[in-house]
C-alpha cells in the first residue's frame, strides 16, 4: 500500500523512494493486529508498530488513529472485488505522509493498484512513469505506472506493476467509479487480471492522523 514501499489494504507507494510509506505489499508479511467482518464487507488492518488503534463495525464503517512510528494501513471493501461504484464518506486527517485510496490487487497479471483520493505531504507519483489521465467523478486523475522488483505480494515474493490514478482535486467522500479507471488503464497498455480484494484504505508512514470512514 504505501511504501518504502504499505499493506494488505490499502492506501501505498513506491518502494524505490525511501521517504515513501511502505508498500502495502510489504506490510502483508506482518501479523494483522486485528481484522473483522461486518456489514457484508471485507476488513483488514495491519501495522508494524504499536501506536495505532483500529475498530470496525456494521455498515462498512471503520475508525483508525495512529501516531508517529512505522507503517499502518486499514480499510473496508470487497473480496473478491469487481468493477463497481465505490461510495465512501466520513473524516480523514493526516499529518505527514498518508494516503486515502481505493486499493486492490489482481492476479494474472499480478497488479497492485491505487485510486488515490487524498494524500498528505508525499505525492505517490514521485518516481513513477506518467501514462496519461482520465476524467471521472468530478476531477482529472493522473495515471502512473511503477514496478516493484522481488517484493512481497499476495502471491509471495514477486515482481509486479503498480498502477496509480491520482486525483487532482483532493477530497474525502464521494463515489469512485472504479470501472472508469480500470478501462482507462487498459486503454493505456496497463492490463488487469482476475480481481482479488479491493478496499477503501487509509495508510500512514511515519506520520500521525485519524480516519472515520464508511464504505458502501
From Swiss-Prot:
Expression induction: Expressed throughout the entire infection process during in infection of rye tissue.
EC number(s) recorded for this UniProt protein: 3.2.1.8
SUPFAM superfamilies from the UniProt entry: Concanavalin A-like lectins/glucanases (SSF49899)
GO molecular function: endo-1,4-beta-xylanase activity
Reactions catalysed: Endohydrolysis of (1->4)-beta-D-xylosidic linkages in xylans
Signal peptide limits: 1-19
Domain GH11: 29-216
Any Pfam family matching the protein: Glyco_hydro_11
Main location: secreted
PROSITE patterns assigned to the protein according to its UniProt record, in alphabetical order: GH11_1, GH11_3
UniProt-listed GO biological process terms: xylan catabolic process
GO CC aspect terms: extracellular region
Uppermost EC category: hydrolase
UniProt pathway: Glycan degradation; xylan degradation
Coiled-coil annotated residue ranges, if any: none
Keyword Secreted tagged: yes
Residues at the active site: 112, 203
Highest taxon of source: Eukaryota
Role: Endo-1,4-beta-xylanase involved in the hydrolysis of xylan, a major structural heterogeneous polysaccharide found in plant biomass representing the second most abundant polysaccharide in the biosphere, after cellulose.
Family, similarity comment: Belongs to the glycosyl hydrolase 11 (cellulase G) family.
Name this protein carries in UniProt: Endo-1,4-beta-xylanase 1
Amino acid at each position: 500500500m504505501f511504501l518504502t514501499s504499505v499493506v494488505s489494504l490499502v492506501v501505498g507507494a513506491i518502494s524505490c523512494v525511501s521517504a515513501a510509506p511502505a508498500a502495502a505489499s510489504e506490510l502483508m508479511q506482518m501479523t494483522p493486529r486485528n481484522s473483522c467482518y461486518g456489514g457484508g464487507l471485507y476488513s483488514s488492518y495491519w501495522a508494524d508498530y504499536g501506536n495505532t488503534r483500529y475498530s470496525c463495525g456494521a455498515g462498512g464503517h471503520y475508525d483508525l488513529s495512529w501516531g508517529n512510528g512505522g507503517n499502518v494501513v486499514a480499510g473496508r471493501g470487497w473480496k473478491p472485488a469487481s468493477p463497481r461504484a465505490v461510495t465512501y464518506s466520513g473524516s480523514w486527517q493526516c499529518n505527514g505522509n498518508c494516503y486515502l485510496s481505493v486499493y486492490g490487487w489482481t492476479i494474472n497479471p499480478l497488479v497492485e493498484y491505487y485510486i488515490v483520493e487524498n494524500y498528505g505531504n508525499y505525492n505517490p507519483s514521485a518516481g513513477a512513469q506518467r501514462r496519461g489521465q482520465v476524467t471521472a467523478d468530478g476531477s482529472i486523475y493522473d495515471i502512473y505506472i511503477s514496478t516493484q522488483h522481488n517484493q512481497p505480494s499476495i502471491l509471495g515474493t514477486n515482481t509486479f506493476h503498480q498502477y496509480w490514478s491520482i486525483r487532482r482535486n483532493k477530497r474525502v467522500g464521494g463515489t469512485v467509479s472504479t470501472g472508469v479507471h480500470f478501462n482507462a488503464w487498459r486503454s493505456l497498455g496497463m492490463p488487469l487480471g482476475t480481481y482479488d480484494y479491493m478496499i477503501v484504505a487509509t495508510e500512514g508512514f511515519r506520520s500521525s492522523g485519524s480516519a472515520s470512514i464508511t464504505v458502501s
